[in-house]
Structures are given as C-alpha cells and as structure tokens.
UniProtKB/Swiss-Prot annotation:
Keywords: Cytoplasm. It comes from Streptococcus pyogenes serotype M1. Gene3D superfamilies: Winged helix-like DNA-binding domain superfamily/Winged helix DNA-binding domain. Belongs to the RecX family. This is Regulatory protein RecX. The lineage of its organism: Bacteria, Bacillati, Bacillota, Bacilli, Lactobacillales. The gene is recX. GO terms for cellular component: cytoplasm. Modulates RecA activity. One of its GO terms (biological process) is regulation of DNA repair. It comes from the Bacteria. InterPro entries: RecX_HTH_1st, RecX_HTH_2nd, RecX_HTH_3rd, Regulatory_RecX, WH-like_DNA-bd_sf. The keyword Cytoplasm applies. It is found in: Cytoplasm.
Length: 258
C-alpha cells in the first residue's frame, strides 16, 4: 500500500492509503516509521504502524489523564476503554506506565491515606472502601492501614463533633451522636469509644433543663399538628427519650407542660 496523503489534524495526523483506507496516527508514529507521502508499506509494516499508533495515542491519553492527579491502574485502564483503545494495547500501556513509575497502586494508596491523616476525617474502613473502588487491591491497602495510627484523627473528629453539638444535645445523646458519626466515617467501635475519653461531657442541671425545654418546644410544634391528648404525650415522651434525656426529667416536664 502507498501513502497518498498525510495531513495534520490538531494533535494527530490523518494518513490516507491508495486502498481507500485512512487512519489517525501520532507524531511519534510519523517519526518512528519515517512516514511520508508516496511511501510504500507492506502488510506487516502497516500492522506494526497501526499497533504503535494506537499504543502511542493511548499512552498520550493516559499521560494527559495522569497530569491532573494520581490514578490507579484500573482508573487509567477504564479511561482508555472509554476512548476505545483495544484491550491488548491497554495492557501494554499499563505495563509501560508502571515501568516508568507514572502509576503505582501502592504509592497511590499510601498518599491517599497520608492526605486523609492531614486533612481528612475518614477512618480505616471507609478509606479501604474508597481505595477498593479505585481498583486498588486489598494487599496494597491493608499493610499501609495496619501501620497507620488513627487515634489522633479520631480524637480530632470527635472534638469537632463535640464542639458542633454540645449546646444542642444532653450528654448521653451527645456521646451516641459522636460514636455513631465516627462509626459511619469508618473508625472502629473501640477507637470511637476511646476518643470520647478526651472530651468533657459534664453539664450542670440548668444546662440540661434548658436543652430539654428547647427540645420539648420543638417536638410539641411538630407533633401537636397530628396528635393530641394522651397520644401526644406518649409521642413527646418517646421523642425526648430518643434524644437521650432522662425519663424522670421528661415526665416532670410533661406534667407541667401539658
């Protein structure tokens, strides 16, 4: 086959052959195969050129994708699939990028976990799930997590939650709120409970009573639209008890309130 036309199209070159076939190639392909108009290619040369052209194009796509942030092997492969790069070419590109240290799942996991320690609020269980979603294998994640101390981060997160809710909830409800939030963020139950030891949950009776009054008013406005009489009283009691208030305190308030 003879090349009848070579035309630059933005970042690629359009090559047309005398058998009416056309294809896009990278500049690296032009240089490597010394392509020019009227050059004759046999079938083997043409197949080699096509393979290299897609490899070069796919690698350029991958490097562009990696220029924004670190990515996992799977993320790069998925990106290339979206651009219709063939599977065997993707495998070659991933191998090259690994050899050239553009991608490294272990380093990515380590960086992700370290950044969370500095600026994040996630515990090890959630971190592992997020890394697995990126396609990183457990054997690349688990050793790093096992060597990372999450106690200070748990204390930092619990303190932030304490500051946010201490004027809104009684001690028991506040403890439950912080514990549940830490569990949701991926910290272990033991770590969540241990982090509470660094917080001061002491509230005087007047503070608790003020909180109870405020919550009772709130729940009454909500529930009195649907209920009245004994049913309303029951609903108010249940709502306040779930919030962590003492049963005797609730009953005393309800006697004077209704």
């Amino acid at each position: 086959m003879k090349i009848t036309k070579i035309e630059k199209k933005k970042r690629l070159y359009l090559i047309e052959l005398d058998n009416d076939e056309s294809l896009y190639v990278t500049e690296d392909t032009i240089v490597r195969f010394m392509l020019s108009k009227d050059k004759v290619l046999d079938n083997d040369q043409l197949e080699d050129m096509k393979h290299f052209a897609q490899l070069s194009y796919g690698k350029n796509l991958a490097l562009y994708f990696l220029s924004f942030q670190q990515r996992s092997n799977k993320q790069v492969a998925d990106y290339l699939r979206k651009h219709e790069i063939e599977e065997h070419i993707i495998a070659d590109i991933i191998t090259q990028l690994q050899e050239e240290q553009w991608i490294d799942d272990t380093k990515l996991a380590d960086t992700y976990i370290r950044q969370n320690q500095l600026n994040g609020d996630k515990g090890p269980q959630v971190l592992k799930q997020k890394l697995l979603q990126k396609g990183i294998a457990s054997h690349d994640i688990d050793p790093i997590l096992s060597q990372t101390d999450f106690s200070q981060l748990a204390q930092k997160v619990s303190q932030k939650l304490f500051d946010k809710y201490q004027e809104k909830l009684p001690p028991k409800a506040l403890k439950d709120k912080i514990t549940q939030a830490l569990l949701t963020k991926g910290f272990s139950y033991d770590l969540a409970k241990h982090s509470l030891n660094h917080l001061n949950f002491d509230q005087d009776n007047q503070e608790i009573e003020d909180l109870l009054d405020k919550e009772l008013d709130k729940q009454y406005r909500k529930l009195s639209r649907k209920y009245d009489g004994y049913t309303l009283k029951q609903k108010l009691y249940q709502a306040l008890y779930r919030k962590g208030y003492n049963s005797d305190d609730i009953n005393c308030k309800l006697r004077n309130y209704l």
